[in-house]
């Protein structure tokens, strides 16, 4: 009996660990956003989980919404807690309040790549794919979980919670894309979308490898963009590492 109980406890612990993996958490958030986008009116055409070719390989886009009012390119982050960041910073920070201990509340902090920069790469890929059709209005949006408290400074960029996503999209109400162009855009995106499992797996492995290499480079005070040395500097928002080849290379990363 005790063995069965122990096996059950271990099984639940393993299941919780698997469900807490970043990849699964991310996919859960993407599904949540996809369901919200389904409730937009018929004039909005949604495509989820698109992978497009680029000059550097491939890029994966969480959601694209094509409408008469523009093309919305959406990056989903299923994060909770306090989210700190600036529009042009290399990294943002997630701060989580944990359990109450005898010495006070425990907390965790995690850094992650600035999602605005991620989404800029997505918008460039879409522009390149659609270049022969015309120059269309593209509205990039970063959307976080409703459990995230956004303490960010992004005056030129839309960063919202799940609950505000549809209303933010509907705020764009000036028609700028014709019905025929919408059909051509969807056709172009669908034909360019890479669906082969092997290529998608290669993309995921490449992203993980690049993140690891980038982390190691920064730890060794080497610029991951150009290979020059990173030097410590002090700016308006505190101490940071900047590329020694500035202004030729403008890579920076905050120091906490």
Residue spans for each PLM region:
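Surface-exposed interaction regions that form or flank ligand-binding interfaces
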Residues: 1-59, 66-71, 77-87, 91-256
